[in-house]
A protein has these predicted regions:
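Terminal alpha-helical segments
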Residues: 1-141
Length: 141
């Protein structure tokens, strides 16, 4: 492991992830299910970018599952991310649908499932970050 973690950069991005997840929950509770799904995706994307940037790694792209692979996360969490990856564009882009609007295609169940997936991903990332900090501290002792 490298000898430096950028705590400020991690905190900057993880704070954004947390507030975005809260906004997703507000949208879900207000019936804006497509926006809740999109924001759950965004919250997870921000959290993995927190981890990658905090460890000095590239964080280019929007696929949470691919970004998690760069961070060497396990398959179970990557599979949750694959659900969220599908919410990046069609949740907000009317061109994604031949009829109707994005609002017509997302349910309460979709929204709360996306939020739960996002919570799991964020928790996993926060736990891995704490573990890295602990390892680095031990290396320095």
């Amino acid at each position: 492991m490298g000898s430096y973690l950028d705590e400020d950069e991690f905190n900057r991005w993880i704070t954004t992830a947390s507030s975005t997840l809260k906004s997703a929950l507000n949208d879900a509770e207000s019936g804006f299910y497509n926006w809740a799904c999109f924001k759950a995706q965004q919250a997870s994307e921000f959290s993995i970018k927190a981890y990658l940037r905090g460890t000095g790694n590239d964080s280019f792209g929007h696929s949470i599952s691919m970004l998690l692979q760069k961070g060497n996360f396990d398959t179970a969490i990557i599979n949750k991310a694959k659900k969220l990856d599908k919410y990046y564009i069609p949740t907000r882009d009317t061109d994604s649908w031949s009829d109707g609007t994005p609002e017509d295609y997302y349910t309460k169940e979709d929204a709360f499932d996306a939020i739960e997936c996002s919570r799991s991903i964020i928790t996993e990332i926060e736990n891995k970050w704490r573990s890295l900090k602990s390892e680095l501290k031990k290396e320095r002792e």
